[in-house]
Amino acid sequence: VQFCYALNPNDATINNYMGVFYDAFDQPQKVLPYLKRAFELQPNEYWYQYAVYLLQSDDKKLAKLAICNLEQVAQNNPKDEDIHTLLQKAYIHVEDYKRALLIQDQLDSILGYNAASAMQRYRLNMVLHDTKRAISEVERYLEEEPNDIQFQIFRLELYEETHQPSDKMIEAYSALLPHQPRNWILLNNLAWHLCISGGDLVMAERLSQTTIMAEPTNSVYLDTYAWIMYNKGNYQDAFFYIQRALEYAIPETKKEIETHYKAILKKLKL
């Protein structure tokens, strides 16, 4: 290759090979000039190795140079998936997540909107701490694929984090329930939201009963069941279960359980 380079130093392919070989033989100081020259000679052909090598460095200036070059190539090849994918990775590398989201729009125009797109949009919005947009993206995908369990979980986690209204929580928990019927946390939380929202107390009782049968010393589950009994007007049973909840309470749950305990005592006039 060196012989070929000596004969034709302005051949893009030879320059690219020189860079690749020096990289393979761990001579980094010699790699960049050849890859750069190959790119300069034929940017639409030899952009990949040059950009990848620039992005491997921790030097932000080199990463920004890669972005500049990739933007140029992307303009000349607006429908090339590989270019835009690497360009998006480059923006993520320099922590320009808003620009990475804009590149996702271009990728969607090439590949169509799909699970990978929705996942990327969800992740980027979460990195940007834009939970509202993250929720919107998850809900958008679930409109097309309502049975996607992973996105149902994402939605539920986001709803919990942002304290969404009970009707939205009930919808999210109910959608996931058929896929995870033995997830006691899910059953308990659905029962709780049905209870506090004035929903189906019969269903809430059934769900909550299942959890305390599975984990009879779980103070949170016992408290939920006691509060369902309270809302049904069954104060004797409510008192029995709230006492058990207090017996097994941990510091993180004790305060709310004590609040419910006082409310039940008031109804019993004790």
Put a short name on every predicted segment.
Residues P9, P43, P78, G112-Y113, ...:
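Short coil turns that delineate tetratricopeptide repeat
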Residues T13, E45-Y48, D82, A116-M119, ...:
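Start-of-helix register in tetratricopeptide repeats
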Residues V31, A66, A100, A134, ...:
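Single-residue signature of alpha-solenoid repeat helices
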